[in-house]
């Protein structure tokens, strides 16, 4: 009974989110609550909700302060010199231009937002592609690949996986650093090859990176080196585990505000400017905590896993991560991030655990493609339409051109994960 009720709840959740009949927050709260009431748990289900919220709180705190921190750093101009350096280095050489596009996307995507990455990188590089006569599909592909392999502890897929499985984002990410470096190396190699194939016309004037008047008033060029050192310190202490991620970004944000915008009024304006992006995702993560808490505490998730395990050979459990890693990128075309990470991933992780595996391996396998390399071409994410529109290419043309390279990147990272023993074959 519990297994059937849990399956019905998950399918209802996925259906509501994919059909846009209600927002993810509404579905993540009301669907499991309704299932718990039908299952006879009554108001006792609230303790499961509280347990879920408690487990997700550190992840939510990290996300909020990471988004605010990188937003303030972008306002202060941390990225501007990097953009100018890349534009100056690439010159008129197609190979450098395409590789520079990927490098710039990797740097800008440090804030964890694919949309922001595309909004900064593509307008900055598009004039260069135009004056050199380069294929704009290459621009879209290079930016997409770089953002796709750049899964970080504070990016959406990692946070969702951590929230769904009650794990820390750092524990998921740290073993994947080598895999990510292999993915980045592959992206750079592909960009070199795409640039080598490209033909360029002689440019009479290379574009420059210009700022609006509003952006100029926010910039703090005299504090660039401090901001760079602070950012490296925040990321370094977080990855090495010296301090918890939420605390690292919290302290970093406070220092960034005091040094760059010492007036309290200016600090408030900067926080308000980025609060919407931070709180929207934070609300979804908190609702996901309610969902996972109810599904786990009520026993529905375990009942599904037990039922599925009874129909699978025990030896087959070891292959779940590698199969998921291979399929993760194409699955981005079928599931949006919320429906997959909060609906599908917990079931796969529970089955893998019951067959003798570690749930964290399933999370790491999902990160290889599900809404990482998959999001720039998935029709279920607005960012995929954004990258095509900003590049000035047809959406279907972008999909056809970029999909093989994005899938290849996920396959290369799957091989790397096996080689580094992140999960077994």
For the regions a protein language model found, what residue spans apply to each?
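Hydrophobic alpha-helical transmembrane segments of multi-pass integral membrane proteins
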Residues: 64-65, 92-124, 311-355, 359-360, ...
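Re-entrant/interfacial helical elements at transmembrane boundaries that shape
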Residues: 68, 81-83, 116-128, 155-167, ...
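Membrane-core helix-loop-helix motifs of multi-pass transport proteins
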Residues: 127-221, 358, 368-369, 379-425
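Transmembrane alpha-helix interface/packing and boundary motifs in multi-pass membrane proteins
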Residues: 13-21, 70, 104-113, 144-150, ...
């Amino acid at each position: 009974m519990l297994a059937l009720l849990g399956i019905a709840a998950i399918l209802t959740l996925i259906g509501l989110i994919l059909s846009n009949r209600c927002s993810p927050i509404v579905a993540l709260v009301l669907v499991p609550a309704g299932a718990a009431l039908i299952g006879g748990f009554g108001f006792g289900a609230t303790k499961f909700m509280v347990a879920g919220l408690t487990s997700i709180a550190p992840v939510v705190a990290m996300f909020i302060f990471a988004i605010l921190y990188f937003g303030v750093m972008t306002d202060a101009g941390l990225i501007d010199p990097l953009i100018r350096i890349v534009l100056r280095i690439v010159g008129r050489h197609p190979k450098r231009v395409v590789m520079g596009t990927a490098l710039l996307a990797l740097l800008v995507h440090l804030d964890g937002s694919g949309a922001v990455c595309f909004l900064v990188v593509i307008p900055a590089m598009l004039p260069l592609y135009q004056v050199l006569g380069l294929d704009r599909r290459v621009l879209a592909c290079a930016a997409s690949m770089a953002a796709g392999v750049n899964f970080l502890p504070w990016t959406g897929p990692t946070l969702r996986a951590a929230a769904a499985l009650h794990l820390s984002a750092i524990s998921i990410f740290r073993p994947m650093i080598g895999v990510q470096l292999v993915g980045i190396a592959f992206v750079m190699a592909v960009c070199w090859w795409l640039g080598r194939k490209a033909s360029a016309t002689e440019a009479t004037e290379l574009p420059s990176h210009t700022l609006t008047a509003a952006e100029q008033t926010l910039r703090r060029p005299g504090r660039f080196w401090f901001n760079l050192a602070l950012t490296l310190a925040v990321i370094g202490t977080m990855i090495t585990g010296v301090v918890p991620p939420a605390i690292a970004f919290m302290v970093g944000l406070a220092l960034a505000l005091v040094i760059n915008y010492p007036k309290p009024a200016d600090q408030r304006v900067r926080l308000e400017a980025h609060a919407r992006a931070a709180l929207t995702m934070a609300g979804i993560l908190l609702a996901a905590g309610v969902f996972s808490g109810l599904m786990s505490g009520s026993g529905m998730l375990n009942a599904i896993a037990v039922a599925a395990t009874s129909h699978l050979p025990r030896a087959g459990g070891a292959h779940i991560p590698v199969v998921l890693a291979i399929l993760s990128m194409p699955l981005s075309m079928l599931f949006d991030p919320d429906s997959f990470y909060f609906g599908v991933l917990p079931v796969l992780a529970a089955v893998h655990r019951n067959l003798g595996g570690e749930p964290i391996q399933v999370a790491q396998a999902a990160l290889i493609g599900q809404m990482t390399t998959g999001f720039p071409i998935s029709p279920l994410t607005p960012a995929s339409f954004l990258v095509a529109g900003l590049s000035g290419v047809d959406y279907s043309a972008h999909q056809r051109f970029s999909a093989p390279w994005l899938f290849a990147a996920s396959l290369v990272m799957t091989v790397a994960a096996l080689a580094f023993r992140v999960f077994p074959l």
